Structures are given as structure tokens and as C-alpha cells.
Amino acid sequence: MAEKFISDNGAKVHDRIRISTDAKTYEGFLLPRHNFSGEDIVVLKLDNGYNIGVSVEDAELAILSKAKKDKVEFTKKKKNKELKDITVLATGGTIASFVDYKTGAVSPAITAEQLVNSVSALDKVANIDAEPLFSLASEDMAPKHWEGIAKKAKEIHDKKQHGIVIGHGTDTMAYSAAALSFQLPEISNPVIFTGAQRSPDRPSSDAHLNLVGAAKAAMTDLGEIAIAMHQTTDDENVALWRGTRVRKAHSSRRDAFMSPNEGPLGLVKENVELKGKYRPTAKETKMESGFEDSIGMVWSHPGLGIGDWESITSRKKGVVIAGTGLGHVKSELLESIGKTAKDMPVAITTQCLSGSTNLNVYRNGRELLQKGVVETYDMLPETALVKMMWLSKHRADEVRELMGENLIGEISNSRKLG
């Protein structure tokens, strides 16, 4: 019905049209109908940036202007000698995406150059070199990609001495930030991850402020891997979160990230305000890249049985347990966990959003310690997994000793009681 209505009126996708109904008149650009559109619905991109579906029943259509067929090309911007140089690496994610109107879904498609050129405010912040690295949804990121990002970052630091902004999907950004933190323990210039909860083509997108904030942070003396994302739901400032102490805590809000047990490393408004203790940049970037993939993570829960534990751990070279509360697992699992701990490193952290493990409080916790399970205090589960993967590759004989030690700021509360 809608397709015939459009065809009969001679309209084509991206034409500017007016649709009038008995109730209201709408003007905007005609968008492709996606697979889930109703048969009587046409989709318009309004001037305010929002999309709207309009029923064609008893409606009239007028073509205001035909679609332009000119290809949009980005011109090379002149270098501003008064500004610093940074490199933006695009790896995919919502920040490098747009709404695919054939499906109604968000698809990674924007190039690194398009992303940078879409944020005009960047021209006043820094001279930008944009480089594509991957075009991946966050959930498709794997340890091999962490290694690729680290190698590229070191290459840029060695050749250009640029600060680096990495555009990344938000769902697994905390894993990637932790991974680079261990691979690049010393950096000569900042490495800042950023992303977006809403794609750049939406008027409510957080991509622009996050990218500008990350660019400003990339020109400081911050010698740690960090994440730059909205601190609140408004557009007032961007928070900088330590790469080993951050997790995504909300699935869709713009202020999605938090650092349990500690605040942000800094805030970005007009300027960057770094807070508290942080590592300054080093003379050169040091790298130990690579991970052991066969490390497992087990979340303790009421239904977890011995068979589940043995099935998960049978082909692994190390295991991280996300325990309940202070670091608890079921009593019936203690013997099986003890057997596993004789063959491979087993570490435990807490599922809780705040607080720390303390295996000295309850009997089960003390038994875990006696059986060789390593307590990791308030290390985040995501970080603990990445740390064991990295240690197993580079410090295989010291994993048990080092999992509970604070190497690069991954543990903020390392008290040992009892």
C-alpha cells in the first residue's frame, strides 16, 4: 500500500516531500521502508533529525525537491600549526554506525574519516589523522583484536608521537581497555577509548561530545589507558575512567560507565581536569602483546553444579570465578574447585558492583584459600579475566602469585585480613 502510494506520486527515496493528512502535515526526506514497516507506513527524516512513520491512508503527497545524486566527498583539512596532532583509530561500534533503514537496525558503516569529519568541533581541538583498523560490532571483538589495537598504538607512538583516540563499541569496551592496559603498561602519549550509546546520525547522539572529550584527553600527560564517556545524561561533561577499573553499568543510557570503589580519573569540560593519582606519560611506549585464549570465567549461582564446573574447566588453562558477595561459591563445589586449583590457576572476584572479596570471613572462603584459590579483592570480573589471559601468556609461572597483586591499578583495595 505504501509502496504503491509512493510510486503513484512519483517519489523516490531521499526526495524531500510533504505528506498531508486530515490531522497534520509533515515535511522531510523520504527514507527507505525497513523490513518491519507496516504496509501503510512511509518513513520520513524530519528537519529536527528524528524519523517518523506516517500512514498513507487518506494522505496526499507533494514532492518539494528531488534527491541530490552528488557524491559527498571530504576534503583534506589544512593543518593548524597552533594545535597538537592526534590519531583517531576506528574499530567499529555504535560511534561508527548509522541506522540501516532497510532493517531499522544500527549497522557499523562509517569510516574513520567520515566519523572525524562529522564532528566539526574537532577542528578547534586538534589536527586529526583518521585511520581505520576494524569495522566490528563490540560483541565481535576478540583477544586477537586487542593485540592488533596495541600493536597499532605502539606503532603510532613510535612514529608520530601522537595521542590516540580509539572509537570502540561500548558493550565490550571495558574488556578492551583492560587488555590494552596490561599490554601497554607504559605509554609515551595518552590512549583514550570512546564510543557512543546512540549512533551519530541521531540528534540525541552522545558521539560528538564523547569524541571531543576523548580528543582533549589525548593531549594531556595521562600515561594510562582510559575510557572517555558521558558522566551524566546531559551534555555537560565527559568522565575519564581508568582502563582497569571501569565497567559498563547501563545498557542504553549515555552515562553508562562507572568505576566501582573509586571515582573518575578526571573530567573534561572546556578543559581537562585530571584528579587524584595517575601515572604520567613515559619516555617511550612499552608493549607485551598477546593473550592465552583458553581461560574460563564461571559465575557462581544457585544452580551451578559439579558437572557444570567440570564441563567448563576441563579444557581451560585457568579459571576466574565471579563469586557472590565476599567471594562465595556453593559448599558442594569446594572439592572440585580444589582439584582444579592443583592443575591450573583459579582466582575469585565478586559479582557485586561495589565492595571487595574477603575470603577470611566465612568458612567456605577460608577453604577456598586453603585449596589455593587466589583472592583478587575488588578487581572487576572483566579485568580479572583479561589479567589472567595476559599473565598466562607472559608470566605463566607466576599467575598464582600475581593475580592478587596490584600491577597497574586494577586493584584499589588490596587489604589482606586474617
Predicted features and spans:
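ATP/NTP phosphate-donor binding region
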Residues: 4-5, 51-53, 60-154
